[in-house]
């Protein structure tokens, strides 16, 4: 929680532009905490982190910024799903358990953009809570807790519930979540900020 808040609070977090998401701010703290708990190797921690970034970035690409338009922060929402896979990998979950972890975190993924209206500090919390949510979901799944089996495409899954507005739902392309999988690594498309501010402002700053 604290590492995620710190990463995002400093506003120097890296950005996956196509997914409009700061994936590292949630997935790396999640990987660090879970790896420490299970005494994982550095290699296993990095593999889990990469899996989380890939998942969160690709989910962000599906909605093409649509979450922003309806008031949700993709870093918090998509980061939660990425973190459930990070923790799940490090906990050794099988395929069914990983599905359950994602189905559980569906009920935890959040991040309101209302902070933009009055400068509230809650934005900084989003990646930290995403990490906590992912870890919690993975541990619950490991113990047999049952989550939604269709967390993304279900009737009330992520894309139908969060993007219920026809304009944004129609613009979503689920195929982008798996396009080029194992061939195209979205982590290679993560940009490093030259300035500690929202990347949309960098052109003006420069």
What is each residue range found by the language model?
Residues 7-17, 59-70, 114-120, 181-190:
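Glycine/charged-rich beta-loop-alpha catalytic/anionic-binding loops adjacent to active sites
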Residues 32, 64, 85:
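Short glycine-/small-residue-rich flexible loop motifs, especially phosphate/cofactor-binding loops
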């Amino acid at each position: 929680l604290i590492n995620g808040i710190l990463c995002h609070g400093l506003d120097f977090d890296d950005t996956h532009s196509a997914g409009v998401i700061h994936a590292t701010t949630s997935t790396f703290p999640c990987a660090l905490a879970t790896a420490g708990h299970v005494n994982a190797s550095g290699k296993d921690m990095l593999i889990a982190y990469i899996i989380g970034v890939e998942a969160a970035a690709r989910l962000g690409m599906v909605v093409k910024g649509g979450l922003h338009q309806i008031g949700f922060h993709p870093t918090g929402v998509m980061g939660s799903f990425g973190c459930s896979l990070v923790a799940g990998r490090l906990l050794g979950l099988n395929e069914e358990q990983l599905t359950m972890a994602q189905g559980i975190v569906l009920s935890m993924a959040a991040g309101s953009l209302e902070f933009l209206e009055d400068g509230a500090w809650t934005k900084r919390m989003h990646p930290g809570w995403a990490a906590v949510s992912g870890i919690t979901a993975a541990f619950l799944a490991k113990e047999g807790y049952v989550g939604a089996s269709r967390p993304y495409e279900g009737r009330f899954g992520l894309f139908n519930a969060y993007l219920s507005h026809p304009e944004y739902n129609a613009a979503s392309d689920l195929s982008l979540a798996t396009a080029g999988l194992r061939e195209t690594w979205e982590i290679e498309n993560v940009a490093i900020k030259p300035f500690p501010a929202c990347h949309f402002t960098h052109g003006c700053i420069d």
